Amino acid sequence: MNTLSELSSYVYLLGNDARILHLYTEGENFMSIHELLQDLYEVCFEYYDTFAEMAISHGESIPNPSDIVLSEGIDWNPTFGDAFSTNFIIGEVKEKGNKVIAMGDNLDGYEGFVKSEIDAFNAELDSIVNYKFGRIGK
């Protein structure tokens, strides 16, 4: 079973990668991708804080984000580079965004308020990842 602590770690990683993609976006559809990536990382960092606080209130510990990618238990490939094409960005966002959505969907054992926050995050993330990024270039 996933925990809020694990979910918050993956949300942070997604936000961090979205910020890197945002900084180095280039090429066609630059402005729309640049703005959507900013929306994505802002949503991720807002919910990272919410989920981390909820995890702590449930007796879970939250790792320092600087250590997250170094953890052996984390299944994540950080985004590296300094120039990203439209297709690369869309692929990264969809792959990693849907991974985080699936984690939230499979999170059990928390009371209704926590689940409602996870559902709200997943809905917002799904809107950005699968709808807005899915429409780029169409």
Predicted feature residues:
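Intrinsically disordered regulatory regions flanking bHLH/HLH domains
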Residues: 1-8, 53-86, 101-102
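Short, solvent-exposed segments of well-ordered alpha helices
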Residues: 1-12, 31, 35-38, 84-87, ...
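A structural signal for well-ordered alpha-helices, especially hydrophobic packing surfaces
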Residues: 4, 8, 15-18, 22, ...
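Acidic/histidine-rich alpha-helical segments that form the ligand environment
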Residues: 14, 72-123
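Helix-loop segments that flank and shape redox-cofactor active sites
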Residues: 14-39, 60, 103-114
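Long, contiguous binding/interaction regions
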Residues: 25, 35, 62-75, 91-98, ...
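Conserved alpha-helical segments that form or flank metal/cofactor-binding pockets of metalloenzymes
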Residues: 31-67
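Short, charged low-complexity intrinsically disordered segments located at boundaries
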Residues: 43-51, 73-74, 79-83, 127-134
